[in-house]
Design a protein with these regions (language model features):
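Acidic/His-rich, metal-assisted hydrolase cores and their charged scaffolds
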Residues: 1-273
Length: 273
């Protein structure tokens, strides 16, 4: 609520790069609470746009499969006749024309769009229209992989290239910690401890290098398991439990989505929209 209030007070837009399935709906849940509890009395009727065809479809799936998609807290709201991810001022953009019109509207608003790491999809258009604005804010609500545009912005990039144009970053860049679709260290430790048949080998294959190696050491110290965080290309024989090949230890520079051929990029954009 503080981020929204500060942005709207400046007269800017709040742009939220979010994964279409799960994270977008989670943001809608939080924003509904902000509106319902009147946490922004100075901006009570602000509009929220979902600008992602996949996110719109996923949200419809949530509406149509209530018992499968919501937790106990949300089900209590539903039992009371409250839709946990729907509220006054919620708008959706499906067509490209609807998407373009969002940026013609000068009123301060919240824009939720994909992809969550800003590598493709309509979010890149909204970044182009808002990054140069000192009154706007980009709020990251998910992990940003090194090499992605989202990672660059979150780590202080002063200029970025979008659609062949260099954009100066003047908007406020904010990270919302504590929101993750993954289990944390304690939850993973608890899960490993519940395994009845002790694994012969544990591979830590997700996360940044230092974090993965630290967790592998934690697993070994806690359970005595043979744990390792392999590099890309490392090969292990799962029968003999031996390492048979070393992968690359060099950091591979990530190729941006806009470097793809036209047809490949079109397909990629549709998948992450």
């Amino acid at each position: 609520a503080k981020v929204i209030n500060a942005t709207f007070t400046r007269g800017g837009n709040l742009v939220i790069p979010a994964f279409s399935v799960g994270r977008t709906q989670e943001m809608l849940y939080f924003i509904r609470r902000i509106k319902t509890e009147n946490l922004l009395p100075e901006h009570p009727n602000f509009e929220v746009y979902i600008d992602s065809p996949l996110a719109v479809e996923a949200t419809n799936v949530f509406h149509e499969n209530i018992s499968d998609c919501f937790d106990e807290e949300a089900m209590e709201l539903i039992s009371a006749g409250i839709n946990p991810i729907k509220f006054p001022g919620l708008r959706v953009a499906v067509s490209s024309d609807e998407s373009k019109m969002i940026n013609f509207d000068k009123k301060p608003k919240v824009i939720i769009s994909a992809s969550g790491m800003c590598e493709a999809g309509r979010i890149r258009h909204h970044l182009k229209h808002n990054l140069w604005r000192s009154d706007s804010t980009v709020l990251f609500v998910g992990y940003q992989v090194p090499g992605t545009l989202g990672y660059a912005l979150l780590n202080g990039a002063k200029k970025v290239k979008l659609f062949g144009e260099e954009i100066e970053v003047r908007a406020s860049i904010v990270n919302l910690p504590g929101i993750s679709g993954h289990a944390d260290k304690n939850q993973l430790t608890e899960w490993l401890g519940a395994i009845k048949n002790k694994p012969e080998h544990v591979f830590i294959v997700h996360g940044e290098e230092s974090t993965a190696e630290s967790f592998a050491n934690h697993v070994h110290e806690t359970f005595g398991y043979d744990a390792v965080a392999p590099y890309s290309g490392d090969a292990y024989d799962l029968i003999t439990n031996q390492k048979v090949a070393d992968g690359s230890r060099k950091l591979v520079e990530k190729k941006a989505a806009y470097g793809m051929a036209s047809r490949e990029k079109t397909i990629f954009d549709r998948l992450v929209a």
